[in-house]
Amino acid sequence: MKKAYYGDFGGQFLPESAMFALNELENAFLKFSKDKFFKKELSELLKTYVGRPTPLYFARNLSKKYQHEIYLKREDLNHTGAHKINNAIAQALLAKKMGKKKIIAETGAGQHGLATATAAALLGLECEIYMGATDVQRQALNVYKMELLGAKIHAVQSGLKTLKEATTAAIQAWVGDIKNIFYVVGSAVGPYPYPKMVTHFQSIIGKECKMQLQKLNKKVDYIIAAVGGGSNAAGIFYDFIKDENVKLIGIEAGGLGVDTLYHAATLNKGETGIIHGMKTKVLQDDLGNILPVHSVSAGLDYPGIGPLHAFLFESKRAQYHAISDEECMQALKLLCKEEGIIAAIESSHALAFLEKLCPTLKKKSVIVINLSGRGDKDMQMIREYKKGVIYG
C-alpha cells in the first residue's frame, strides 16, 4: 500500500502551494508520533485533562431488550463531550511543537470546533473556527462555548452553509497563510497525511476497547459506529481491522431515505471522485459536481468520506448501512428511557442499527457501539424535530 493511499483512495489533490505545508506536517507527525517526550505529554493530557480511558459500559437494559450483550464505548464522557478532543488536543500539541502560533479548524456539529478551541486555550494558541451559517444556527450552544474559550467564529455563507462549505473555507484560509497557520482537520479526511494522522490519534478508542474487552474476558462480534467523515469509526475500527472475526459496521446518514435527494449516504450512493484534497467516494452528479446533502445531524451531512472507509467498503472488510432521521431519533429516545443516557444525534445513528441487526443474529452476540458524543448540543434540534419545524 502506497504511504499516501488506502488501496486506491487518499492522495494529495491540492495546489502546489500547499505541498510544502503537507510535507512539513508529515515530517513533524512522523517525528513526534515516535518521540517519547511528545507521547508522554500527550498521554498525560489525555489522562488528566480529557479523562481517558473512557468506560466500556454494559448496557443492561438494552441488552435485555435485544437479547444480546451490548456495550457502549463512552466517548461522550470525554472533556468537551465527544471523541473529537482526542485528535484536537494531539494536533494542537503538534502545532505548538512545530512553532505555530495560530490554529484553525472546520466544524459541523461544533464538537470539533469546541475541542480545538479548548486545546488552543490550554496551550496558548490563537484559534479561528470555520462553520457553515446553517450549523451556526442549529448549534448555537457550541458556538457560544467556542467564543467563551476565545475562538473567533467565521460563519460561512456559501452553498448549503454546512460542513462542506466550512471545510472549503478553512482550506482556503490555510492555503492563504500556510507558513503561519496550522490547520487542525477534524475528521479522517483531506490530503495525506491528515487521514493517517487523525486515525492514529483516534485509534486510542479501539486500543482501550480491546483491552477493556480482554479484562472482561469477552470476544466482540460486532462493532458499530456512525460515519460522516469517519474519525470516530476509524478510531474504534483500526485496531480490529486485522481480526476477521470482528464485523465492522459503519452507519451513514440516511436522512429522508437513500432513494430521495435528502441524505448523506456517501458509500451507499456515491462514486469515486475528488473532494477536499483526497480521492474517495463522493456524492456527485454526472458532471462531477458535488451534490447537496441532508441529515438531521450536523456532524454527518458531508458529501465525502475518509479514504480509509472507502477502502474498507471496497475491500468488503467493513459494511456500511444507512439510518434515516426518524430511525435515529427513535433510537435517541430509546437510549434515554432505557439507560438514562442522552446521546448525540450522530451517535444515535449507530444505536438505531441495533433494531435492524439484532433480529437477524442466530446466536447471542457481543456488540460494541461507539457512543461518540453526548446530546447536550442537540437539545434545540431534538425539540424542533419533535415539533416538525425542520421539515416545515
Curated annotation (Swiss-Prot):
Which residues are recorded with the post-translational modification N6-(pyridoxal phosphate)lysine? Answer: 84
| Annotated signal sequence range | none
Instruction: Name the UniProt key words of this record, in alphabetical order.
Output: Amino-acid biosynthesis, Aromatic amino acid biosynthesis, Lyase, Pyridoxal phosphate, Tryptophan biosynthesis
User: What cofactor requirement does the entry state?
Assistant: pyridoxal 5'-phosphate
Q: Which Gene3D superfamilies does the UniProt record give?
A: 3.40.50.1100
Is Isomerase one of the keywords UniProt gives this record?
A: no
A Pfam family the protein falls into = PALP
Reading the lineage from the top rank, the first entry is: Bacteria
Molecular function as annotated in GO: tryptophan synthase activity
A GO term from the CC aspect: cytoplasm
| Entry EC no(s) | 4.2.1.20
Please write the reaction equations for the catalytic activity of this protein: (1S,2R)-1-C-(indol-3-yl)glycerol 3-phosphate + L-serine = D-glyceraldehyde 3-phosphate + L-tryptophan + H2O
What pathway, per the record? Answer: Amino-acid biosynthesis; L-tryptophan biosynthesis; L-tryptophan from chorismate: step 5/5
Subunit structure and binding partners: Tetramer of two alpha and two beta chains.
Similarity section: Belongs to the TrpB family.
- UniProt xrefs under HAMAP family: Trp_synth_beta
Q: What does this protein do?
A: The beta subunit is responsible for the synthesis of L-tryptophan from indole and L-serine.
Spell out the protein name for this chain: Tryptophan synthase beta chain
Species source reads Campylobacter jejuni subsp. doylei (strain ATCC BAA-1458 / RM4099 / 269.97)
